[in-house]
């Protein structure tokens, strides 16, 4: 269990046990970490029974000694955890479909935030490609005949999205590439572009369920473009 998973389960108050902290410390020791606080926390495995209060105290010492930071809110912790899964896959520690399975499990456990719908849409499109349907493809700009390559590309985008502040309900929103206006009109549609009711731009309001529009959204954010009030 890596740090991102540990702290998410901690803040989510789900499945977290004193033994999880001890296993995390042992994994750090195996990776070559020699911080005294890590040794002390790992040594708690020999305690019968394990004292949860002592484990918590030592965990806080580890955080301080290693210069780590605990996320202040659930959403930040979730994004860090989800990103770490993608990064592990991109680094070769996870297989692409293992990453997808993890993302879908998170989406199933947590209906919101909607950002994990990026993965639900990808799996749906890959399935549509396999059965050769004519349904809308949110990922039609990718080579869907190479699923693992698509998964890696989407993982790169997902990590970038998790690193910035996103509008409420993202990606279930429309975003104007000209004026930055946001609309929460229905995104479950084959229409991927529409007229912006704010600036009047023709086909400038983009459905962010579509992969290519999220790429443009990211570029606009990195270039310093800002959002205006929802229309």
PLM feature segments, named:
Residues 1-231:
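Acidic, Ser/Pro/Thr-rich low-complexity regulatory regions
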């Amino acid at each position: 269990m890596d740090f991102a998973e540990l702290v998410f389960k901690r803040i989510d108050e789900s499945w977290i046990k004193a033994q999880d902290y001890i296993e995390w410390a042992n994994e750090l020791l195996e990776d070559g970490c020699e911080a005294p606080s890590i040794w002390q926390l790992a040594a708690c495995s020999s305690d019968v029974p394990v004292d949860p209060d002592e484990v918590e105290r030592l965990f806080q010492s580890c955080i301080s000694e290693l210069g780590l930071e605990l996320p202040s809110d659930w959403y930040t912790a979730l994004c860090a955890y989800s990103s770490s899964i993608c990064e592990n896959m991109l680094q070769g520690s996870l297989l692409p479909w293992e990453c997808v399975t993890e993302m879908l499990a998170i989406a199933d456990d947590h209906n919101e935030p909607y950002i994990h719908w990026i993965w639900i849409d990808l799996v749906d499109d890959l399935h549509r490609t396999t059965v050769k349907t004519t349904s809308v493809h949110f990922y039609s700009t990718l080579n869907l005949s190479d699923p693992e390559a698509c998964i890696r590309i989407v993982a790169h985008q997902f990590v970038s999205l998790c690193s910035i502040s996103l509008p409420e309900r993202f990606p279930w929103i429309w975003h104007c590439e000209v004026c930055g206006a946001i609309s929460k009109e229905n995104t479950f549609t084959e229409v991927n572009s529409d007229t912006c009711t704010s600036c009047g731009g023709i086909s400038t309001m983009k459905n962010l369920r579509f992969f290519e529009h999220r790429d443009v959204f990211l570029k606009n954010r990195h270039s310093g473009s800002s959002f205006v009030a929802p229309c």
